[in-house]
Design a protein with these regions (language model features):
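Residue-level hotspots at or immediately adjacent to binding/recognition sites across diverse folds
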Residues: 1-206
């Protein structure tokens, strides 16, 4: 397995579309997310509105993204998330929506209740946002970097994503992103928020 959610229900994801989940910590359920049972999933997040069902989002290789509902110790059938991009069409002076051409990997995903938004990050600075806990579509955003983004978290009213080459970018809504100074060129592989500060780890002991 390559990743596990940071809150209940605890869901681990990995190669061959496998996942395992538990709420109690003692009984684990095992299944497959789908996508031909061939995809490696690299990240997983848990989201809830405080009043509705708890949802799980898994992201992985080849632009794979899927969502399911957690019910007790079980996970419902996984629903693939469609990827879209919006482009300005000068001839008609409006923005139109198209199917995304992104085929790279996703590495991390996070949900933030106050923003009502999932944020997924991946190769070549790719960021996709999904507004609404149960939405079935994700839209690409401009990150301002071409570095692969390896992880994302939320804290202090900001989404923070980290990646290769010391890349750190931030957004207060998941849509508009700006660079942060990291003072390193080492690849940054993960980030957490402990309620008081962000902690980032990376290559070469960073």
């Amino acid at each position: 397995f390559r990743a596990i959610s940071k809150q209940e229900p605890y869901v681990a994801v990995g190669a061959s579309s496998f996942y395992m989940n538990t709420k109690s910590g003692t009984f684990w359920e095992r299944g497959r997310i789908g996508f031909g049972d061939t995809i490696t999933f690299n990240g997983v997040g848990v989201g809830d509105s405080g009043t509705s069902d708890v949802h799980v989002m898994a992201v992985g290789d080849f632009a794979s993204m899927a969502r399911a509902v957690a019910i007790g110790n079980s996970i419902s059938a996984w629903t693939p998330i469609d990827l879209f991009e919006q482009r300005q069409i000068p001839a008609i002076n409006q923005v139109s929506t198209f199917d995304s051409t992104y085929t790279g990997n996703f590495n991390g995903v996070v949900w933030e209740r106050t923003r009502d938004t999932w944020v997924a990050v991946g190769a070549a600075g790719s960021i996709f946002t999904t507004v609404g806990l149960t939405s079935t579509g994700a839209f690409s955003q401009f990150s301002g970097t071409l570095e692969t983004l390896n992880a994302v978290c939320y804290g202090q009213s900001e989404y923070i994503a980290v990646g290769n080459g010391g890349a750190i970018i931030a957004s207060n809504d998941g849509f508009a992103w700006s660079d942060k100074v990291s003072n390193t060129v080492n690849d940054l592989n993960d980030i957490i928020y402990d309620g008081d500060r962000f902690i980032v780890v990376g290559d070469s002991g960073t």
